[in-house]
Amino acid sequence: MEVTDVRLRRVNTDGRMRAIASITLDHEFVVHDIRVIDGNNGLFVAMPSKRTPDGEFRDIAHPINSSTRGKIQDAVLNEYHRLGDVEEIEYEEIGAS
C-alpha cells in the first residue's frame, strides 16, 4: 500500500490543529479529515474520528500496523513541510462564525 496523493489545507485555529489532509491510497481509496496536530513532542497525524455519546473520540479509519501508520504520517508531514516553504499560504479559518 502506498500513499499516492496528499491534499492539505493549513488551518488557523487557537488550538493545536495545524492542517487538515486527504490522502489517496494506491490511486484507489481516499481518506478525508486527517488532522496535523502540534503535540507536546512535535507534529503528528491524527486519523479521522467522531465523538461517541459518552464524549470519547473513536477513529473512523486507521492503519492497523506501524509500518502503514509511518507511511501515512511521513507523506502528510512531508506535504505539510513542503507547503511551509511556500511564501504565501492561505489559511482557512476554522470555527469562525
Curated annotation (Swiss-Prot):
Keyword Transport assigned: no
Keyword Cell division: yes
GO annotation, biological process: asexual sporulation; division septum assembly; sporulation resulting in formation of a cellular spore
InterPro entries according to UniProt: SpoVG, SpoVG_sf
SUPFAM superfamilies: SpoVG-like
Domain of life: Bacteria
Keywords associated with the record: Cell cycle, Cell division, Septation, Sporulation
Pfam families in alphabetical order: SpoVG (PF04026)
Coiled coil: none
HAMAP family: SpoVG
Stated role: Essential for sporulation. Interferes with or is a negative regulator of the pathway leading to asymmetric septation.
Family, per entry: Belongs to the SpoVG family.
The protein, known as: Putative septation protein SpoVG
Organism of origin: Bacillus licheniformis (strain ATCC 14580 / DSM 13 / JCM 2505 / CCUG 7422 / NBRC 12200 / NCIMB 9375 / NCTC 10341 / NRRL NRS-1264 / Gibson 46)
Native organism taxonomy: Bacteria, Bacillati, Bacillota, Bacilli, Bacillales
